[in-house]
């Protein structure tokens, strides 16, 4: 299964903010959209990613104000990405080795989607269902 197939199943919605957005405003969007991370994009350039984990570690635990802190101060600027043609195994390997939960999807340096650990798990479950159905059909012949 490819990243493109996963995005076709889940949708290609991408939520982002600019680097001068406050953490509070970014969190507000994350809450409204029920997402665990938001991309930081200036123009069409991916600058970073802000996750709930970043907020907890860099705002809450350091007793900072989310209304007075900009996302570029706490975002993760080293962003690991995948392409539409990458496969599910590549996503799992990258998420596991880098200990991350979200992978922006780029095509020609433009963000076209984002894959979460939840999307990967759902894809694995679907693949297992297909395998079980195939085996059941084979056995019943």
Q: Where are the regions a protein language model picked out?
A:
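Tandem CBS (Bateman) regulatory domains
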Residues: 1-12, 51-80, 87-96, 117-141
């Amino acid at each position: 299964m490819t990243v493109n197939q996963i995005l076709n199943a889940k949708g290609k919605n991408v939520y982002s903010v600019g680097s001068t957005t406050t953490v509070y405003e970014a969190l507000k969007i994350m809450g409204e959209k029920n997402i665990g991370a938001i991309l930081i994009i200036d123009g069409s350039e991916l600058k970073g990613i802000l996750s709930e984990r970043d907020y907890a570690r860099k705002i809450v635990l350091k007793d900072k104000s989310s209304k007075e802190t900009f996302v570029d101060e706490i975002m993760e600027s080293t962003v690991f990405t995948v392409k539409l043609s990458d496969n599910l195994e590549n996503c799992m390997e990258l998420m596991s080795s880098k200990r991350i939960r979200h992978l922006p999807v780029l095509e020609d340096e433009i963000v076209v989607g984002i894959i979460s650990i939840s999307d990967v798990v759902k894809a694995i479950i679907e693949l297992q269902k297909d395998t079980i159905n195939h085996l059941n059909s084979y056995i019943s012949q």
